[in-house]
């Protein structure tokens, strides 16, 4: 993996250090509310649970596979941390994000293997 690749959010889209600032867009929420037929109560921002509250299913690592992968690849290409597993537990569809933002994770990978490059 390249060093300049940033970590994606476990609870949403994009880089974890980037947020959408709507403070200079006063008409955005009224527009969304009107177009989606929502009420003012629906405008409440729901924050995700903390990452510490998310309980992942246990890992079932095949140590022989893990050893072989780590010997064939660079160290930064094979990840087994809970955060890496969480990031790759779901896609980024509305349903997936709704579940993960509430800490609902029914399955997750045992490890994550990255390609050498995106080329």
For the regions a protein language model found, what residue spans apply to each?
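Noncatalytic alpha-helical scaffold of FAD-dependent oxidoreductases
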Residues: 1-119
């Amino acid at each position: 993996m390249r060093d300049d690749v940033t970590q994606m959010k476990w609870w949403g889209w994009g880089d974890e250090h980037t947020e959408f600032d709507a403070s200079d867009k006063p008409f955005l929420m009224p527009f969304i509310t009107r177009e989606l037929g929502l009420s003012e109560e629906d405008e409440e921002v729901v924050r995700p649970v903390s990452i510490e509250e998310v309980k992942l299913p246990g890992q079932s690592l095949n140590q022989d596979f893990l050893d072989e992968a780590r010997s064939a690849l660079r160290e930064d290409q094979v990840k087994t941390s809970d955060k890496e597993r969480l990031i790759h537990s779901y896609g980024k569809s509305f349903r997936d994000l709704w579940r993960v933002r509430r800490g609902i994770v029914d399955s997750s990978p045992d490890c994550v293997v990255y390609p050498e490059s995106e080329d």
